[in-house]
């Protein structure tokens, strides 16, 4: 989550350890946009990454097209707003985005809140969460749309969809994928990453 992810080489160093936020388990990246300023969209790079270690736990990033998992989701917001994400974008707490420890960045996943069956496609553009038993960290806006912002955490299902485009904002398209318990419609191609069309 908006962390300086030189984790593979720095996670075991004393210098890195001194900077780790005990609440989140990682060091925060620099804030490049202040609250109230316009947050630029896109601008990152496609990244899978090498294995890395945080707080004694090894994470192995991979491009797993069949990824589907259930676990706890949390959300992050003001503390990380305007900071660089792990793939070089800028975190916007009001965008439809998420942090995941191993999935490619940027990519799309559908997140379903198992308590109310709301689901939403979000953009994974950061690494995390690294605290407790959390599986994915959603932006403030994503947690609000999925109905668990006030609770702080929710049990969710995460399903990988595919790569996300590097440039521009996809927020409007992603908000349109919100489902309130009804099945998602047949996929429609709305973006492209390289030569591969992405269906949302």
Each predicted region: which residue ranges?
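Secreted/periplasmic proteins
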Residues: 10-200
């Amino acid at each position: 989550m908006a962390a300086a992810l030189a984790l593979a080489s720095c996670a075991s160093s004393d210098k890195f350890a001194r900077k780790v936020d005990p609440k989140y388990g990682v060091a925060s990246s620099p804030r490049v946009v202040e609250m109230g300023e316009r947050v630029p969209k896109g601008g990152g790079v496609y990244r899978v990454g090498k294995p890395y270690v945080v707080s004694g736990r090894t994470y192995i990033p991979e491009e797993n097209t069949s990824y589907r998992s259930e676990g706890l989701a949390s959300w992050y917001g003001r503390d990380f707003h305007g900071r660089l994400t792990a793939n070089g974008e800028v975190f916007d707490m009001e965008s439809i985005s998420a942090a995941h420890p191993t999935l490619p960045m940027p990519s799309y996943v559908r997140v379903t809140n198992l308590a109310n069956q709301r689901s939403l496609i979000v953009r994974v553009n950061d690494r995390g969460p690294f605290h407790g038993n959390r599986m994915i960290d959603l932006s403030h806006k994503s947690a609000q749309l999925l109905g668990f912002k006030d609770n702080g955490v929710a049990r969710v299902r995460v399903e990988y969809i595919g790569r996300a485009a590097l440039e521009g904002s996809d927020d409007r398209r992603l908000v349109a994928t919100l489902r309130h318990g009804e099945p998602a419609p047949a996929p429609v191609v709305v973006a492209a990453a390289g030569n591969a069309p992405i269906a949302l």
